[in-house]
Amino acid sequence: MEQKNRILRITRTAVLIALLVVLQAALMPLNNSLITGSIVNLVLIISVMTCGLSSGLCVAAVSPVIARLFGIGPLWSLIPFIAAGNAALVVLWHFIGNRSIGEKKYKARLAALFTAAFAKFLVLYVGIVRIAIPVFLGLPEKQAAVISNMFSIPQLITALTGGTVAFFLIPRLKKAIGGEKG
């Protein structure tokens, strides 16, 4: 039974990564980072909440690489920071969103939504805007400003948007896959 569950979790993780690839490719013509970012965050949250922490972390690490390969993401040197921001989102959704506050799971998921979104924003803002760009990258001022803008408030907005959609989808998905009743 343990082996079957492991295979199922790996398969679901692969499906979520494939979904991420398809969605990023499909959204590329829109050239709208708010839509793409929100959907990526949604997939990250769904992966951790339906498949577990290891699945969520796997998708979190693969996501920025896929984005860069599609030409969506910024510089290769920023991928570790982006993966760290994704990991913060995933870890907090896992540890907060899977808890019950009183009898209500929705309270924990609401707490996860806001806490994880802010944590991802903070990791990206500090890591990229305050450390990577001024200390390591030596970018021209105009390029530094564009990248700094990408990794500030828009990241909070996309994490909150993806989290809000996930908040409503998770109970239905878990019920559909047999992971949660009602």
Outline where the language-model segments fall.
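Loop-helix junctions at membrane interfaces
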Residues: 1-182
